Amino acid sequence: MRKTIMMMCVAAVLAACSSHQDQQGWVKVEGNKFVDPQGNELVFRGLCFSDPVKLVGDGQWNERYFAEAADWGANVVRFAVHPTNLNRMGWDATFEAMDQGIAWAEKYGMYVIMDWHSIGNLKDAKYTNPMYDTDLEETFRFWRTVAQRYKDEPTVALYEVFNEPTVTGPDTGECTWEEWKGIQEQIIDTIRVYNPDAVCLCAGFNWAYDLTPVATAPIERPNVAYVSHPYPMKRSQPWEEQWEADFGFVADTYPVVCTEIGFCLENEKGAHIPVISTDVYGHHITEYFEKKGISFTVWCFDTDWSPTLIDDWNFTPSTQGRFFKEYLQKKAAE
């Protein structure tokens, strides 16, 4: 009975949020910019949440968590939905948890990026870790479910089709850009059957870093933006010219969202390639994004998944957390 009452309350909150957002309309792509429902340019700056299922298990998927993200200055949060976690907790329970999360995000004035968080080669169903295991059938099912469930939820503004495509990891098979482009277009077409308004985010290879193929063979669908994950060790310093050649040039024509950035010191918890750096990277990447009008979310608003933004569940900022909290709050106040 208590569960029924709770779900009725969640449904009521979501209905109210939907009514409010319907009056505002959807974020859309115009040229190389995101535009809010009032016609103003919108730059997304926010935080990557770890998997909703993980956070439920940790007892941290709650309003306090979302309120803290908003207090840091985020205007967007990213839900990293791992296929194996979705199946472990169950689709119904996971989506019910995300319903509540979307209501909290809307309450605190934040948009949501829905991220199908797998790493590897979707064409050949070969992945870098069992937690990312999925296939095309399940991927289409996920996006049908998202598009149907949230077709009246403009808070869920961005659909990140596939987290990190790669064919250079061990045993990840083969896939050309033309093949991957076609798969992404099929997923977008599936989404658009149920929700023609959502902006779809498309990534390139090399763990979603490389967007060079977009120069000659862009995604042939409207209302799309591109993703890159320019962690500090993807290229050696000086970074800017290489960033421009690898992904930044795309922002001259289409919106770009770097849905994962971040760093940690060499001696900090979880330090690994390609994230080891200092706040020198933080200064360079944020200055570059401002110059190019690139949106971003920082990985990861969690105590375990590195590079972490927080050291504990009192939300004590880590080294990168101190840098990005100050930066986000400054931008939010402008």
Task: List PLM regions with ranges.
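Aromatic-lined substrate-binding rim segments of carbohydrate-active enzymes
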Residues: 61-123, 138-140, 180-195, 274-293
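Acidic/histidine-rich helix-loop elements
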Residues: 42-64, 84-90, 127-131, 233-236, ...
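Residues embedded in well-ordered beta-strands within globular domains across many folds
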Residues: 46-48, 78, 160, 201, ...
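Feature marks short, surface-exposed loop/turn motifs that line or immediately flank catalytic pockets
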Residues: 51-53, 80-87, 120-122, 165, ...
